[in-house]
Amino acid sequence: MHIKKGDNVKVIAGKDKGKEGKVVATEPKKDRVVVEGVNVIKKHQKPTQLNPEGGILETEAAIHVSNVQLLDPKTNEPTRVGYKTVDGKKVRIAKKSGEEIKANN
């Protein structure tokens, strides 16, 4: 998967199209990512010993990785991800600017 935890992404399809956020979690086996403040759902929580009140909680749900695009670190625009070998290591690069994408977990 070309998107990692900590990346800044923009939603390019779906009900939250145009929103930007940071990737909180990735689910590589399902090809899904959880983005901060995007695809917020209301979840009904039963009362438990830890949370005696219960109630309705708002949480972010995962969206498909094809619906988000990485933001270029140089221009802050959506870009595709490429790979390049530097000093024997495979690094991610932004296709638009050629800038190396650092892993910022």
Swiss-Prot record:
Looking up Pfam families in the UniProt record yields: KOW, ribosomal_L24
- UniProt keyword RNA-binding present: yes
Q: Which GO terms describe its biological process?
A: translation
Q: Which GO terms describe its molecular function?
A: rRNA binding; structural constituent of ribosome
Tell me the CDD domains matching this sequence. Answer: KOW_RPL26
List keywords of the entry alphabetically.
Ribonucleoprotein, Ribosomal protein, RNA-binding, rRNA-binding
Q: Does the keyword RNA-binding apply?
A: yes
InterPro entries, alphabetized:
KOW, Rib_uL2_dom2, Ribosomal_uL24, Ribosomal_uL24_CS, Ribosomal_uL24_KOW, Translation_prot_SH3-like_sf
Q: What is a single cellular component term in the Gene Ontology annotation?
A: ribonucleoprotein complex
Family, similarity comment: Belongs to the universal ribosomal protein uL24 family.
Q: Please give the subunit comment from the record.
A: Part of the 50S ribosomal subunit.
Function, as annotated, reads: One of two assembly initiator proteins, it binds directly to the 5'-end of the 23S rRNA, where it nucleates assembly of the 50S subunit. One of the proteins that surrounds the polypeptide exit tunnel on the outside of the subunit.
Designated name of the protein:
Large ribosomal subunit protein uL24
What organism does the record attribute this protein to? Answer: Staphylococcus epidermidis (strain ATCC 35984 / DSM 28319 / BCRC 17069 / CCUG 31568 / BM 3577 / RP62A)
